[in-house]
């Protein structure tokens, strides 16, 4: 319930920022009523929706996942306000870490990536079809790197002939490149490399599953003790595939 309440709070703050950006600076009571009243109505409507309410009261991943999604949205809107200030990159970095933590919980947060890149694009550039297309291509690359490269790729690399030691060396190399880019003041490269490292640090929470499973606890679903079983666990193979049929096999009255 706590993280669900925090998600509602972050939604309220995000709506305040969106309305303020649209209407401009708050100057009178009417502005106060529209901005804060609209944000309260929007946040409370979401709070009492059936899906969010029942996610809040059950022990599942969706409440935390919603919280991480809400905080990423709020952070990029906060960055939008401070994009011209020195040190605005810190918001991009904390967003990267939040995405890493979130993917260690549920993949829903990956859907915030297009939102983040579009906010950055419209804040920094004037709309043109060519630049917009390039932005969409970059968005797809970022999604592919995180989903296929880090989330699915690293475990498969570790299970391949390269092994755990080779994967560890690869991760150390990424850390080394990050340090080099920061020390040599390569601004764009340092932001990219730091973001990748922060995503890796956040995603590393999955190692807890692997370590805990090897201790053979009483409840050990899917038993991800080996790299092969861990890959199966990460790819959600236990849920099988959904078979679509034209007619329902069971009808409800």
For each of these PLM feature ranges, what is it?
Residues 243-253:
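Single conserved hydrophobic/aromatic residue that forms the stacking wall/gate
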Residues 19, 23-33, 72-91, 118-129:
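Membrane-interface transmembrane helices that cradle and orient dolichyl/undecaprenyl
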Residues 2-11, 16-19, 23, 45, ...:
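Transmembrane alpha-helices of multi-pass, membrane-embedded glycan-processing enzymes
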Residues 80-81, 112-196:
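Perimembrane helix-loop-helix junctions
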Residues 51-62:
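Short acidic/glycine- and proline-prone juxtamembrane loop motifs at membrane-interface regions
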């Amino acid at each position: 319930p706590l993280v669900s309440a925090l998600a509602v709070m972050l939604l309220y703050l995000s709506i305040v920022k969106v309305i303020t950006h649209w209407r401009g600076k708050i100057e009178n009571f009417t502005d106060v009523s529209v901005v804060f009243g609209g944000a309260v109505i929007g946040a409370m409507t979401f709070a009492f929706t059936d899906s969010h309410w029942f996610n809040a009261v059950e022990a599942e991943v969706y409440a935390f996942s919603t919280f991480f999604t809400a905080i990423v949205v709020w952070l990029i809107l906060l960055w939008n306000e401070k994009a011209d200030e020195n040190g605005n990159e810190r918001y991009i970095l904390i967003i990267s870490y939040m995405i890493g933590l979130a993917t260690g919980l549920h993949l829903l947060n990956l859907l915030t990536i297009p939102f983040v890149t579009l906010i950055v694009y419209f804040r920094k550039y004037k709309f043109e079809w060519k630049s917009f297309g390039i932005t969409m291509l970059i968005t797809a690359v970022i999604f592919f790197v995180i989903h296929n490269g880090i989330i699915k790729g690293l475990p498969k690399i570790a299970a391949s002939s390269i092994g755990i030691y080779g994967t560890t060396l690869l991760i150390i190399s990424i850390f080394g490149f990050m340090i080099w880019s920061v020390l040599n003041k390569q601004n764009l490269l340092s932001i990219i490399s730091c973001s990748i490292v922060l995503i890796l640090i956040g995603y590393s929470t999955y190692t807890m599953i692997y370590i805990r499973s090897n201790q053979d606890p009483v409840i050990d679903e899917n038993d991800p003790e080996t790299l092969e079983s861990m890959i199966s666990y990460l790819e959600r193979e236990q849920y099988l595939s959904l078979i679509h049929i034209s007619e329902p096999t069971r009808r409800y009255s």
